[in-house]
Every structure is written in structure tokens, then in C-alpha cells.
């Protein structure tokens, strides 16, 4: 989960009117669309139709094509800083062939899960904080593990005590409950309209795949952070 600034795009296409503007890596853009016949969920804001467009994490400034609105937009790289971690168990840093294969399979599984969203669910974007703990690591930081440059941290870490209740931030459907190599006990929720949220490093998951949950529902118990 990253920070949620809502930016306004106003460029002519058949279904959208977008202003020339530069967006930031990892942000969300709120796009005015002239027609409701646009792929994905359209949110009504007074008399205006809005579509939320996620801007991917970028390693450099570039123009990116947004298929949902058939438009190119400018996106700017942002240096979100770095974090350096020391892990004593080298088997978690330099993976064995079997662990590497497991990681690849799990990545494909997650990709499959995120490829399909339940459009009967309308996201509200009124998120409840899943735990009370403070933010311990923000989105977008370049990770260094034992001095080695690794992937960017595309999540938000929240502090917690062992056994703290983790609640659903908004309504949705449980689409994955699994113990994964990198993130341990993990739950992914589908909030509709291709909006998903993920909860990792859990002590225990208390929901099952296919469950429909409401805001504030307990989905699991925390370890030291999620």
C-alpha cells in the first residue's frame, strides 16, 4: 500500500479528456472520462465520471501508455530513499535451486490472482487502517540486503505486536491465503475494479479464500509487522 494522493488528469481521446501533466512514480491519478463506456470501474464525483489509474514504479522518467484510457501520460521517477537490512540466515538471501523454483511459482500464482477482479464489488477508497502501529518502512525504498542491491520495496510496513488483530480496510473478497517464501502467511483481498490489498508476515490468517468480508473484519493476527 502506498500513499494516496489523487491527481487530476484533464488530453482528448474518444472517452477521456486529460490535461498535460506529469505524474509521479507509484502515485494514483484520477482521470475524468467523458463516457461511462470505459474499461474498469467508473466512480461518480458529483456530475463527473472518474477513473482511478495506478502509476507503476519507474526507474527513470518516461511516457507510459495507459490502456484503460487509450492515452499516453508522462511519469517521473522519484527517489524514495533506501533501506539496508542485515539477514544472518544466508539461505534467505542467496537462494537454493529449490527455493528459487518455489519463489518463481509463487510469483506466477500471485500474477494469476491479480489478473482477475470481481467487478460486482465497487471500491469506496475509504480505507480503514489495518493495524494501529506506526509506519516502519515506506513504499518505494531501494532495498539493500547484506550489502547487496535487491528489488525495490513496493509495500508499506506497519509496526505491530504479536497477536494484534489485522482488519480489512474496506469490503472485498479473499482471493489468496497462503504461506509464501518471502512474505510468510499472506492474505490478498480483492476490493473490486482491479483494486487489491495484500497483508504479509502474519502470525495467522483467520479467513479463507472465497470469503466476502466487510470493513473492519478481522482477517488475521500480526507478527511484529505487516
Protein language model features and the residues they cover:
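Sec-dependent N-terminal signal peptides
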Residues: 4-12
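Cationic-aromatic interfacial patches
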Residues: 14-81
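Surface-exposed, glycine-biased beta-strand/turn segments
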Residues: 74-183
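A residue-level detector for short acidic-glycine micro-motifs
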Residues: 137, 176, 201-204, 221
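Short, well-structured beta-strand-loop connectors
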Residues: 165-174, 207-222
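Short histidine-centered loop motifs in beta-beta connectors
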Residues: 192-216
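Conserved small/polar residues in nucleotide/adenosyl-binding loops
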Residues: 225-226
Amino acid at each position: 500500500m502506498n500513499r494516496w494522493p489523487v491527481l487530476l488528469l484533464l488530453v482528448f481521446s474518444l472517452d477521456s479528456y486529460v490535461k498535460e501533466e506529469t505524474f509521479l512514480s507509484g502515485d494514483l491519478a484520477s482521470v475524468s472520462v467523458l463516457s461511462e463506456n470505459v474499461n474498469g470501474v467508473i466512480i461518480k464525483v458529483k456530475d463527473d465520471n472518474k477513473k482511478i489509474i495506478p502509476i507503476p514504479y519507474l526507474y527513470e522518467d518516461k511516457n507510459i501508455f495507459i490502456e484503460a484510457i487509450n492515452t499516453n501520460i508522462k511519469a517521473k521517477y522519484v527517489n524514495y530513499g533506501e533501506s539496508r537490512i542485515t539477514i544472518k540466515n544466508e539461505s534467505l538471501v542467496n537462494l537454493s535451486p529449490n527455493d528459487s523454483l518455489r519463489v518463481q511459482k509463487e510469483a506466477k500464482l500471485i500474477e494469476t490472482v491479480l489478473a482477475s477482479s470481481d467487478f460486482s464489488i465497487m471500491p469506496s477508497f475509504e480505507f480503514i487502517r489495518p493495524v494501529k502501529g506506526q509506519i516502519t518502512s515506506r513504499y518505494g525504498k531501494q532495498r539493500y540486503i547484506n550489502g547487496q542491491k535487491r528489488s525495490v520495496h513496493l509495500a508499506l510496513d506497519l509496526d505491530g505486536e504479536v497477536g494484534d488483530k489485522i482488519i480489512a480496510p474496506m469490503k472485498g473478497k479473499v482471493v489468496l491465503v497462503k504461506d509464501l517464501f518471502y512474505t510468510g502467511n499472506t492474505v490478498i483481498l480483492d476490493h473490486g475494479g482491479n483494486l487489491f490489498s495484500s497483508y504479509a508476515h502474519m502470525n495467522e490468517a483467520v479467513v479463507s479464500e472465497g470469503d466476502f468480508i466487510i470493513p473492519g473484519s478481522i482477517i488475521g493476527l500480526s507478527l511484529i509487522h505487516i
